[in-house]
Amino acid sequence: MAAVDLDVQSLPRGGFRCCLCHVTTANRPSLDAHLGGRKHRHLVELRATRKAQGLRSVFVSGFPRDVDSAQLTQYFQAFGPVASVVMDKDKGVFAIVEMGDVGTREAVLSQPQHTLGGHRLRVRPREQKEFQSPASKSPKGAAPDSHQLTKALAEAPDVGAQMVKLVGLRELSEAERQLRNLVVALMQEVFTEFFPGCVVHPFGSSINSFDVHGCDLDLFLDLGDLEESQPAPKAPESPSLDSALASPLDPQALACTPASPPDSQPPSPQDSEALDFETPSSSLAPQTPDSALASETLASPQSLPPASPLQEDRGEGDLGKALELAEALSGEKTEGVAMLELVGSILRGCVPGVYRVQTVPSARRPVVKFCHRPSGLHGDVSLSNRLALHNSRFLSLCSELDGRVRPLVYTLRCWAQGRGLSGSGPLLSNYALTLLVIYFLQTRDPPVLPTVSQLTQKAGEGEQVEVDGWDCSFPRDASGLEPSTNKEPLSSLLAQFFSCVSCWDLRGSLLSLREGQALPVAGDLPSNRWEGLRLGPMNLQDPFDLSHNVAANVTSRVAGRLQNSCQAAANYCRSLQYQRRSSRGRDWGLLPLLQPSSPSSLLSATPIPLPPAPFTQLTAALAQVLREALGCHIEQGTKRLRSDRGGPEESPQGGTSKRLKLDGEEKSCEEGREEQQGYIRDHSEDGVEEMVVEVGEMVQDWVQSPGRPGEPPQMLREQLATGEEGQSGHAALAEQGPKGPEAAREGSQGETGRGVSLSSVSWRCALWHRVWQGRRRARRRLQQQTKERGRGSAGTAEWLAVEAQVTRELRGLSSAAQRPEAEPLLTFVASASQVNQTLTVTPIQDSQGLFPDLHHFLQVFLPQALRNL
């Protein structure tokens, strides 16, 4: 327990942080779940193992360079069993010898003098260093919030200059690109020995013009037709001698570094006797903009992933062993898996400086992952990913066609990372986000980029390519294409992107880069666009493989959070803080957009799905649950109306005087929403509230629609088909005051009589007690008392009374709760939307950081409560 207490740190605003795993939890139950989880237990066991190994190990130096691990093992076995010997393979100046037990180690240290081959050995205890987690990566959603980056962007004259500056801070330096070329040349030389005629092609971030510091090195090993005798092609041209000498990495280090043993790992950087490379190096920056401010040189041993320093030396690999392994594998596994294993064996035994080789045959595109020790690069090799090579070249062509593409993509990638929208699992990949930006630029008026179909028609004779049955033809030279006539500034394009994505129908349409338009999912389309395509909450078609939805992994929650975050950003982009440089030294332009989101702001963008029911009944029940079951004081509310009659409507993107009006923005968004959804969707309530949390804007009215300053919030009438709810004569509890729901119903009936029905409802709620903590225990106790009194099963009214009683008990009152005079514990806005039948909860005042716990409780409690009502 003492060790656990040392690993756990209590946070000043509530919650706990596990210093071992670098994980933050909101409460004690979440902490207990983490401490009992696989990741934490694995690191605890690994730390104990490393400590035990250190107590059994000695540091040995002074032996000749030709001494190998077998000779050291034989010498130290005179004192007792030897568990392992790890040699310094780069210089051969020291070794770490792990004895079988602590007693044997003490016997070694008690020997006054050690001699091997006429040389006196220096033997001393291995220095113990503090354990560091092997997975000490930067946290998810890390954003460029360093003082240096803030200063660099704040000094730019306008938003466009900030975006260009961000590209310079994030992209690879020339030395880093040269280093990657050297690694590719090394791979080409080795693989040619096994597969004459093969070609190693880099793809992905390394060549698509959107590279960042520390990005992986993706390689495609093109084996061609190995059955035919072909002359071996020349390896990729290595950099000239002058350029190689100018590089911070001596090219001889790549060619002369001894091959790493299978699965071997370098000594841990926790040791003071860490390896010292002959080449000058410093840390390669990770994939965050902060890294651009560091030195643009090579990785130091301290920046490499930690590994166990006690690995048995298995000797040098050679070509014969790799071929023997390939022969053995070919009889046991399929041809594809056997070839993948052979590539892994070649990387382990024959490529200098490569370690941590892992084959992943179960991936969508099977790969072999590896790490390269001298350069600090991580990468993978694939055998059947020719399509990705053409995708990378297509992205590079797009960046060459217009100089605004790269700043826009870099900015939006950085923004999405800070909002927790991009990454692995159910999040958007960088590739999907880049394609989303390109599709947006194709749909401008006039277009910034041509469609894939237009590029295919302009492909020359030598540029006609077909891969796996898909047409990948497009010009390779951007200079032969006409430039775009669209001259909009970067700041305007960024604001338009946020506004348009927030109103696109991501589920009901397929965003096609080949056609440059949104194709309705329910329509009849040619089979070549649909065969094998997996639809989901977000549908974004690959430009060449038309059966691949690059956003198929995105969940409905992430898609909703993407659109809510875009709407919040669009609202901010209409403010003066975005448009003009602050004279008071405040963050302006891109800086508020790139700040990392707090857990509360991420949750506020996550909608809570509501059960299917007529919207007016649903909102009435929702207000009843908030007020009576949970004891929320509803201070005020707003409603949004929709007109059952047609007619001209003012664009939600409009406004005068102090609001920025984006040319072309209203037209594209309005037309897209009317064509794809049949109605106009507005998120301005949610967006304003999110920017209150994320940007810190001072908003006097807690909810307002775009309109003229000083005027009351404008009621946006949304054009919808007349539905069942619009004729029911009930609007849900807007404008609630002391009179309760009756007053709200009266007002809504009058408006319904004028042909207007409700579209969304919002309430401002205040809580003075933590009514979500201990609720299950209190409910169980009340249910037990009810059974003892002989009462039957509870109906709707009885259920509501029980929940109200639970709330009163949690508040420590015996009668109906009355509002205390102290400040509320938590204030939030609950906004119900009829568009997607969801509820968005946004914190307004949360001094103790309780909103994540409340939001987690509401996600489970509210849908169940509404079903009971």
Curated annotation (Swiss-Prot):
Record: residues binding UTP: D216, D218, N391, R413, Y431, H548
Coiled coil: none
E.C. no: 2.7.7.19, 2.7.7.52
Regulation: Adenylyltransferase activity is specifically phosphatidylinositol 4,5-bisphosphate (PtdIns(4,5)P2).
Predominant place of localization: nucleus
GO molecular function per UniProt: ATP binding; enzyme-substrate adaptor activity; mRNA 3'-UTR binding; poly(A) RNA polymerase activity; RNA binding; RNA uridylyltransferase activity; U6 snRNA binding; zinc ion binding
Compartment list: Nucleus, Nucleolus; Nucleus speckle
PAP-associated domain span: 490-548
Cross-referenced InterPro entries: MTPAP-like_central, NT_sf, Nucleotide-bd_a/b_plait_sf, PAP_assoc, RBD_domain_sf, RRM_dom, Star-PAP_RRM, Znf_C2H2_sf
Post-translational modification: Phosphorylated by CK1 in the proline-rich (Pro-rich) region.
Cofactor: Mg(2+); Mn(2+)
Chain segments carrying region Disordered: 111-147, 252-315, 637-686, 720-755
Alphabetical keyword list: ATP-binding, Magnesium, Manganese, Metal-binding, mRNA processing, Nucleotide-binding, Nucleotidyltransferase, Nucleus, Phosphoprotein, RNA-binding, Transferase, Zinc, Zinc-finger
Domain (RRM): residue spans on this chain: 56-128
Entry's free-text remark on domains: The zinc-finger domain is required for terminal uridylyltransferase activity. Together with the RRM domain, binds the 5'-area of U6 snRNA.
Family listed: Belongs to the DNA polymerase type-B-like family.
The protein's role, per its UniProt record: Poly(A) polymerase that creates the 3'-poly(A) tail of specific pre-mRNAs. Localizes to nuclear speckles together with PIP5K1A and mediates polyadenylation of a select set of mRNAs, such as HMOX1. In addition to polyadenylation, it is also required for the 3'-end cleavage of pre-mRNAs: binds to the 3'UTR of targeted pre-mRNAs and promotes the recruitment and assembly of the CPSF complex on the 3'UTR of pre-mRNAs. In addition to adenylyltransferase activity, also has uridylyltransferase activity.
Subunit structure: Associates with the cleavage and polyadenylation specificity factor (CPSF) complex. Interacts with CPSF1 and CPSF3; the interaction is direct. Interacts with PIP5K1A.
Protein name: Speckle targeted PIP5K1A-regulated poly(A) polymerase
